[in-house]
Amino acid sequence: MRPARIIRRKKNISMKTQYYKEYSPALGREMEWKVYGHGGRPVLYIPCQDGRFFDFEDFHMTDVWAPWIESGQVCVFSIDTIDKETWSDTWGNAEYRSQLYENWIHYITDEMVPFMRNMVNEMNGWTGYPGIIAFGCSLGAAHAANLYFRRPDLFDGLLALSGVYSAEYGFGTFMNDLVYQNSPVHYLANMPYDHPYIQLYNKKKAIICTGQGPWEQPEYTRQLDRILHAKGINAWVDYWGYDCSHDWPWWYKQVTYFVPYLLRDE
């Protein structure tokens, strides 16, 4: 992977946006996020490696999602990671980093998910527990896929672009229970064929896409693809060409291509 470059576009000024900064009990610190939209299905956007919640807007992914946001089909919640203290801090204490990452997972599942559900229920006049689409590019795709496969009771869609799906990327050869349960290629490979989660996965839509050009690492997607196939887990795993690089212009194209399928009722 490489640091994503800034793409300058005209800023979308008509979209409803809301900014939040609140204390997280799971992390013991204040966390920031933004909400884009006025209704529709909830989408959780997780930024690229070491990215911030404002990257969804600053890198103009808002422009790409605008047709679905402004038409009330989706409401996007763009959050912060703590990658610099966890996956990216490869010289740091691995046991500490694995616990901190697990705390971040609980920040999402125990704090952000209820917040998102309450907001979209109020926006849409819904009741109940709407499922959430997890979306990310680069390391954000790794986090999104981990959330989707760990908690199919909370997430009912996945769009993972140019991701890595083994915790070895951030933790090397270190392994404990926390690293294991946050490494999809490890826990899915050992999942029993009759595990109830497999039925849940197969009622949902998961898209896992990678290019094969500069800075991409398609071997991670191929490894996950083999495991999903072996377990009978349905997912649309797509390999784009050798011209498709690990960069925003290609992610824009992939979002435009895949989102209609994710949102289509079938």
Please give the residue ranges for each predicted region:
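Short, Lys/Arg-enriched N-terminal segments with co-localized hydrophobic residues
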Residues: 2-14
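Non-catalytic cap/lid and distal C-terminal segments of serine-dependent acyl enzymes
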Residues: 14-266
